[in-house]
Design a protein with these regions (language model features):
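Long amphipathic alpha-helical segments
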Residues: 1-31
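A conserved regulatory-domain signal marking ACT and ACT-like small-molecule sensing domains
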Residues: 8, 12, 16-19, 37-208
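Short, positively charged loop/turn segments that connect secondary-structure elements
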Residues: 26-42
Length: 208
């Protein structure tokens, strides 16, 4: 349990059935103790468990949430995912150069091992389609919006800050299209129809 503190959180909020959890961890408990253990004993141990880790993590994250900086919203975005190729980097350089022509352009590039994701403002969409026309398009989505959160510098030392933020959106049944991060910024990309609710949830985190 101490290895998975977020299970403690779910237990504290009564989101996990104690009996079901006991059945799941019973084999591991028996193995550790090297003897047969009854499920009732495991349930009693879980119920007596002090949520120290969960409360400490929650307190620290809550403090960070109150210290969140500016929240910036952008709409009319497009999302493209291309297969990584030897020519792709040259094309990325072209779209980066184009995006520098105007402050109205928005562009993020995230390169993975096998694919590269590009999120752009709608006014850059024709240039992306032209520049990358010979590349292998894996997926594209339009009618998106992004919310960028300025994170306090302490976020690097606190586990669970991303979990805490994304959990709120998951509970609201908001599908996150992309998550883009730098050292002290987190950008969440959602569908246009979900941006108002997403913004409201994030502001509630700052204010409450």
């Amino acid at each position: 349990m101490r290895k998975t503190p977020f299970i403690e959180e779910a237990l504290h909020e009564k989101l996990i059935n104690v009996s079901s959890l006991a059945r799941v961890i019973l084999p591991e408990v028996s193995l550790l103790l090297k003897k047969e253990v009854k499920i009732g004993a495991v349930m009693m141990a879980i119920n007596r468990l002090s949520p120290a880790n969960e409360l400490r993590i929650r307190k620290n994250i809550k403090k960070l949430a109150l210290d969140l900086g500016d929240v910036i919203v952008r709409s009319d975005l497009c999302d493209f995912t291309f297969k990584n190729t030897t020519s792709l980097l040259k094309e990325i350089a072209k779209i980066l150069s184009k995006s520098a022509d105007s402050n109205d352009y928005f562009l993020t590039v995230s390169q993975g091992i096998f694919e590269t994701n590009i999120v752009t403002s709608k006014n850059l969409q024709p240039y992306v389609q032209e520049i990358f026309k010979k590349e292998i398009l894996i997926n594209s989505v339009v009618n998106l919006a992004s919310i960028t959160i300025k994170l306090p510098k302490e976020n690097l030392e606190q586990s669970g800050i991303y979990y805490f933020i994304l959990k709120q959106l998951a509970w609201a049944n908001i599908p996150v299209q992309e998550v883009i991060s730098t050292t002290n910024e987190m950008t969440i990309v959602v569908k246009d129809k979900d941006v108002n609710e997403t913004f409201s949830i994030l502001m509630d985190m700052k204010l409450n």
